[in-house]
A protein has these predicted regions:
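Cytochrome P450
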Residues: 1-163
């Protein structure tokens, strides 16, 4: 199921994001070359992984705070990709040139399935944006309980079809 859950989850969160920013959906519909960048911007804006848990393997000090070996740390992926210190603008913009996001982790903890998730999602965004003109909520979405990973359980939408 690696890659499949991420793709399903990220597409659901992506549709929710495009509903919130309809001008960006129009931008994607009008310029398919933005699909890959749109996926990265969706991961930056609303990643499926909201935090990762790590354990300190040695004592260290970070920004004046002492962290003891064995301490459990929760690293907020969402904030790392939206912090104005690291990003020029927190605004959702699928045409923006951004620094690398951490939606798939980093270093030795980088998701091995990220190529699959990205390629599948870009293909899906291209297909969906080709035939879905206007997307809106049809009812309230329900999300997984807050657990470090998130995804719509239900996402009732309605849309105009472009044939």
């Amino acid at each position: 199921r690696q890659g499949v859950d991420t793709t399903r989850s990220q597409l659901g969160l992506g549709i929710m994001t495009f509903i919130k920013y309809p001008d960006e959906w129009v931008k994607l519909r009008n310029d398919k070359s933005l699909a890959s960048n749109a996926f990265d911007e969706l991961i930056r804006e609303r990643p499926t992984t909201t935090w990762v848990t790590r354990e300190a393997n040695q004592d260290f000090e970070f920004s004046g705070v002492n962290i003891n070996k064995g301490t459990t740390l929760h690293l907020l992926v969402h904030s790392s990709s939206r912090d104005p210190i690291w990003q020029d603008s927190p605004t959702f913009d699928i045409s923006a040139k951004r620094k690398k996001h951490f939606g798939f982790g980093g270093g030795s903890h980088h998701c091995v399935g990220h190529f699959m998730a990205k390629s599948d999602s870009v293909i899906a965004l291209l297909a969906l944006s080709s035939f879905m003109k206007k997307i809106q909520h049809d009812n309230e979405a329900t999300l997984l309980p807050d657990s470090g990973n998130t995804s719509p359980i239900t996402l009732p939408i309605k849309y105009a079809v472009n044939y």
